[in-house]
Amino acid sequence: MARSITVVTTFSDAGWEQYGKRFVETFVQYWPKDIKLKIYCDSVQPGYPEVEWIKLNAACPDLVTFKERHKYNEHAHGVRPDGKKKSYLWDAVKFAHKSYCVSHAALNSTTDLIIWLDADVVTHSPVPFEFIESLLPQNHYCAYLGREKIYPECGFVVYDTKSEYNKIFMQDWQALYNTDSLFEEVEYHDSYLFWQLVKKHSANGMQTTNLSKGHPHRPGVHVFINSPLGEYMDHLKGKRKKDGRSKPTDIYYKRDADYWKKL
């Protein structure tokens, strides 16, 4: 029997205008109708009955508390512990939104699987249900885009919400923020914290799947579009949002989709 699936993401009102609207429209156009879409948001956007809109602050009060607690803490907003420069690697507040959304969705899921999908992803080709479900083998808790000697690319992660590891994994993730213990880590962003949690729970028997296996996954390589996901989606990381698509130099594998032929 096929497993039920919900895709989860979040964006602000400003993010809706910049990339969120395109995310939703291409999702509705190309994803299977029996895969649900849940969006944690500031404001509900009218005209999209296919979407379950969740008011972020109401659903995640601990996020509101965390942000208020660190409102004036520059180290929680990207300034390195040594104070020398600012970087996303230490922007705990920015990436807390994603962490709280993932954990809330996973702990309150009504479907077998949830998929975190960054809102700056564009779907360019029809996505087969069977392809999506096949990404996470039975008895594996999560599937993600691994990279060598560096934190994973977490723009796409599949979680089995029925797994025995789901509750403890997500509660541990929330606890990093609720207790401020994330500031004891080398980096503070969601991908690094996810990486540490995967290593911790894998040591206790949790099984995972690396979707980048057999594909380029070195630091600096656009691992998302060079994985099997690239056949159906583009991830507009960083400055690619302004361009509206990835660059030809990002591609390491021949792609058959018309979308990539137009680069």
What residues fall within each predicted segment?
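Short, polar loop motifs at secondary-structure junctions
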Residues: 39-46
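Active-site-proximal specificity loops/subdomain of glycosyltransferases
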Residues: 46-108
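N-proximal low-complexity "stem/linker" segments adjacent to membrane-targeting elements
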Residues: 1-21
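GT-A fold catalytic core of metal-dependent nucleotide-sugar glycosyltransferases
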Residues: 94-143
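Short, acidic, metal-binding catalytic loop of nucleotide-sugar glycosyltransferases
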Residues: 26-34
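Catalytic core and acceptor-binding pocket of nucleotide-sugar-dependent glycosyltransferases
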Residues: 163-263
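Residues at the starts of beta-strands that form the adenosine-phosphate
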Residues: 4, 34-36
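Conserved catalytic core of nucleotide-sugar-dependent glycosyltransferases
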Residues: 124-188
